Amino acid sequence: GSGLKLAAQNCHHELSGAYTGEISASMFASLGVDYVILGHSERRAYNNEDNDLLRKKVDTALSQNLKVIYCCGETLDERNSGVHFDLVAKQIIEGVFHLNVEEMKNIVIAYEPVWAIGTGKTATSVQAQEMHVHIRSVIASKYGGKVADGISIIYGGSCKPSNANELFSQTDV
């Protein structure tokens, strides 16, 4: 194979039913999709998706053997007010902490500093590293270090040629 993996940008929380305009996890699975992105900041903001709904979507996606890229992140106001670490922990705890160890192997966490998406602003490599370490420690608090170390955490903020080397030089990014 080419190593290329397909990902969907969302899926509905129900496997089937009359939900015009929505695409179910089972439809994506039947098309050979490998991953589904859930919890993206735009879906949270514009579609009022909360952690409870995302937990249902996670379960539905996993039931169809899709891997989940679970997004978490904070706005600039949340970062500036100092609640960013607690907010991201809450998003993870409420979205995926109901899963068992085996299910967690199918979760990728995507940290997306909302304030750095499409704004031209970027998180510094230190900010990205701090949050990635925090996310791993949140996961370790429930599942232990071995599981936390095995979870892929990806950076979903603005990454461009001018900052890529600095970001990728960080141990956890």
Locations of regions flagged by a protein language model:
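Active-site loop-to-helix "anion-binding N-cap" substructures in soluble metabolic enzymes
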Residues: G1-A110, V114-V173
